[in-house]
Amino acid sequence: MKQGLQLRLSQQLAMTPQLQQAIRLLQLSTLELQQELQQALENNPLLEQTDLHDEIDTQQPQDNDPLDTADALEQKEMPEELPLDASWDEIYTAGTPSGPSGDYIDDELPVYQGETTQSLQDYLMWQVELTPFSDTDRAIATSIVDAVDDTGYLTVSLDEIRESMGDVEVDLDEVEAVLKRIQRFDPVGVAAKDLRDCLLIQLSQFDKSTPWLEEARLIICDHLDLLANHDFRTLMRVTRLKEEVLKEAVNLIQSLDPRPGQSIQTGEPEYVIPDVLVRKHNGRWTVELNSDSIPRLQINQHYAAMCNSARNDADSQFIRSNLQDAKWLIKSLESRNDTLLRVSRCIVEQQQAFFEQGEEYMKPMVLADIAQAVEMHESTISRVTTQKYLHSPRGIFELKYFFSSHVNTEGGGEASSTAIRALVKKLIAAENPAKPLSDSKLTSLLSEQGIMVARRTVAKYRESLSIPPSNQRKQLV
């Protein structure tokens, strides 16, 4: 064995704390960023929040022309020590992105959220407490409510409920009587044993003089399977109902709720604050950051001036350290805003047809297209478009919504999957309800428009729109 010295040159990327902070801020959603900045304000005395009225607007050029890419790139850049295109896997695990939401709203930007977090069981127990039950019946009612799932159906038999009462002796008739009272709670039909039971309970709440009530009850009691399969021809034959009567009875049944429990929202509220505002001004689409969504930070000059006059080294070091942290945070925030604005402007420039005419005119676009246009890495584009929302006259969308794969067209062009999905939705909306379009027919109609896709692809797009197959869409006209 021989020993020796060898000289080797190598380069490595050093992930400094400042770089980690810059990339992490880039990934955070607006709400997460607000929490991050609020914590920084509480922990760092060298940071303070500025008055929005005194803050200089740095979101867009004075000529209000956001689609000028050259102007968009003329922003204050970060020092070379903050290469935001560094590998995200080394630092942070991305959260789950959200989808597009909502319809058009006015210039005011409210926070969007779910209506309630009350569970179905809580809502039913509230009604139990308001009902004059005996102690025994209240115990039975509690057991019944505990056995109701999120869709509103009873998950156990009445015998199991009776046995769950323990030392309390109750008859099956008592359990049945309490169950019938609960089934008339709001929402009506809750705690039903099955779909047939649920629909019949809801029908029982109608006035006896309601037109087509008996016909609807007949269909539910004896021919629910035919109705589920949309086999109207057989249904007319076995019920001996005329087509007009059958249509009215089916309409009455369709007005009922097959999952009454889902009308009570149980999920946590979802908050959406738009990061970017898109408006049309003087015939051009303008893009700006939502100035109300992010706190404006600045250095506290009073404390900063104490840096050189501190009484001891410990105080001086404390002030210097916090001052440096504050400067890096402000610069990282500026970099985040600049990157978000540049990417958003580029997206709007590429997708102007969508904002003008809708989903059918969405252009195929991938991360690499925007990355090349703004001269950034694809990983940076992915971070800055995740959990960032754009508010436009067409609604609120996550920035990632504007990226979609492409499908070749007959003329040698390309169509985005989003546009094709919109066309499928449009074709189905215009179909004859008595003869709905099959996936094969939809494929043929798309082919006539020069869009060559497989039938299974059309089926996938239809399912992503939560549209049932043609045999389930068939209706009486």
UniProtKB/Swiss-Prot annotation:
One of its GO terms (molecular function) is sigma factor activity. GO terms for cellular component: DNA-directed RNA polymerase complex; protein-DNA complex. Coiled coil: none annotated. GO terms for biological process: arginine metabolic process; DNA-templated transcription initiation; regulation of DNA-templated transcription. Pfam families: Sigma54_AID (PF00309), Sigma54_CBD (PF04963), Sigma54_DBD (PF04552). InterPro entries: RNA_pol_sigma_54, RNA_pol_sigma_54_core-bd, RNA_pol_sigma_54_DNA-bd, RpoN_core-bd_sf. Sigma factors are initiation factors that promote the attachment of RNA polymerase to specific initiation sites and are then released. This sigma factor is responsible for the expression of enzymes involved in arginine catabolism. The open complex (sigma-54 and core RNA polymerase) serves as the receptor for the receipt of the melting signal from the remotely bound activator protein GlnG(NtrC). Belongs to the sigma-54 factor family. This is RNA polymerase sigma-54 factor. The gene is rpoN.
